[in-house]
Amino acid sequence: MKPIPSESSVRMPFVSTRQALSRRRFLVGSGIALSLPFLESMSPAFARGAEKAPATPRRMFAICNNLGLLPEEFFPKTTGRGYTPSPYLEALRDHRDQFTVFSGVSHPDVDGGHPADNCFLTAAPHPGSGGFRNTISLDQYIAERIGHLTRFPSLNLGVNVDRGARSLSWTGSGVLIPCEEKASDVFRRLFLQGSAAETENQVRKLELGQSILDAVAGQATTLKKNVSGADRDRLDQYFTSVRELEQRMQMSREWERKPKPAVSASVPLDPESPRDYMEKVRLMYDLARLAFETDSTRSIALLLDSVNSPVIELGDTKLTEAYHNLSHHGRSEAKIAQLKAIDLWHMQLISGMLTELKRVKEQGDTLLDRTMILYGSNLGNANTHVTTNLPILFAGGGFKHGQHLAFDTQRNYPLPNLFVSMLQRMGIESDKFASSTGTMRGLEMA
């Protein structure tokens, strides 16, 4: 474990020559090690000789919804940069220039229906066959090469996951890496540090509506006095994001509390009911953003195990069957209507995440400019368990987006080619991943 800086180490004066604050700065309190976002004060104003400011990092966030999306609602009917958005992509219209939608792509020889979700980031062939052994996943490939640069080499997250059976993250020897499903556990890992007693004390404070920011308020005030105006705004934005997430995690449990007097017993910060699927997804998106914003990790995978989800809560929309059952709609209009509502909710959550990433500024870019978001599924059509023509959305990361890259829907283009492009954008020298044949054709860096 990396050592935690002393409290006094954050009290460096801000001077005109911009002596750089350490990129590994923390605000430290009892049970707290709060990472700082990137500040301009962390880079010297003048490079001396061969010295250069550290490069702004690039990140990767891969998300798989293992029940996919209704193809006729997701894929645009037209192609190129002038494509007409599909009904689902209309929900992302504010971000049209920040994403590329793909059709006609898949993992060669990855079949088997539902078991293919384990291969979404590995592209290992024939997952449903006897004796199948998985291979390294994209997130772990990245972690092996640059994971030492951050506190956490990678984060492997999940929502309603069938633990022990499903995961996006796999080691080089084909061993499943279990997902972290509780937002509170992820929050602990990111922001709480100290003895077990100190950590539990902070958790109790969160449950009572208090903030981890209270423990470092004095240091935060001192730091803000000694940085530039832009950095003060940046810190205010970051601290607000942390507090809003704390409040959301607390509020998400309110509906599950029985109508009786409040007690001092510990209450989980995150919803435990699988029905609260969408709120869990939103919490994971928020945590991923904060993890990237603080450079706590640069590689995150998130499996949305819709197969393992029951009848989920969807605001005012009433669902009559479990998510998985709805996906086998058999062209039932009633089931399709409910699936559309679920899918559109997913699109709105993605839109919200992209909005938040665009709000965060980092050395002249936005956090979205520096973060590749891969959203897709192992199934092209969950109704028939088809594993070709996968719905793939790729956003951010500093690419020339705003297009529909359409390939042959019968003879698919290899999706692993996109993985090679992503690796190269991460600064990793690689010209091959799994069954790739090169980089993604038609996708250019900005």
Predicted regions and their residues:
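Ligand-binding pockets and gating/stacking loops
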Residues: K2-A446
